């Protein structure tokens, strides 16, 4: 009869977990998503071929606890051209610019989103742009980006 000792795993640092009785709601100014509408065809060197502003409103549920949020603009379908570009498969790349904290959003990474300390709500402003990467393709196009939120 052989016996094997099972490895023992110990969780440490659990005393550093802070439980808060708060929640935050996140509302997109365009609940149906960002719609660029009809875009004329373009040449590969056309630069930005469409731009659409949108905002995200973050609200506390009425509590007074301080907390911050991180966000991940996670690509559900599609491939990235680089950390900040989503290939739209139509000769363009989708980029999202954070106008509140000027920088291009890096997809599939958590980053600072909103500090709710001493605030009941925070509004963030963004611009979504389609930048030409090739000859414009006719037809409908759609990609899904999911906003994941972590409390920190």
Question: Residue ranges of each PLM-predicted region?
Answer:
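Mature extracellular/passenger domains of Gram-negative fimbrial/pilin and adhesin proteins
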Residues: 1, 5-152
């Amino acid at each position: 009869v052989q016996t094997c000792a099972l490895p023992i795993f110990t969780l440490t640092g659990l005393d550093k977990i802070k439980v808060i009785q708060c929640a935050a709601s996140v509302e997109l100014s365009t609940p149906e998503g960002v719609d660029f509408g009809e875009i004329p065809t373009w040449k590969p060197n056309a630069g930005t071929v469409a731009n659409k502003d949108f905002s995200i409103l973050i609200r506390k549920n009425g509590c007074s606890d301080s907390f911050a949020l991180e966000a991940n603009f996670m690509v559900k379908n599609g491939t990235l051209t680089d950390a900040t570009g989503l290939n739209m498969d139509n000769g363009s790349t989708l980029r999202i610019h954070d106008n509140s904290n000027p920088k291009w959003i890096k997809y599939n990474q958590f980053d600072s989103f909103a500090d709710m300390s001493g605030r009941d709500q925070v509004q963030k402003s963004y611009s979504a742009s389609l930048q030409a990467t090739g000859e414009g393709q006719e037809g409908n196009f759609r990609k899904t980006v999911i906003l994941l939120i972590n409390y920190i």
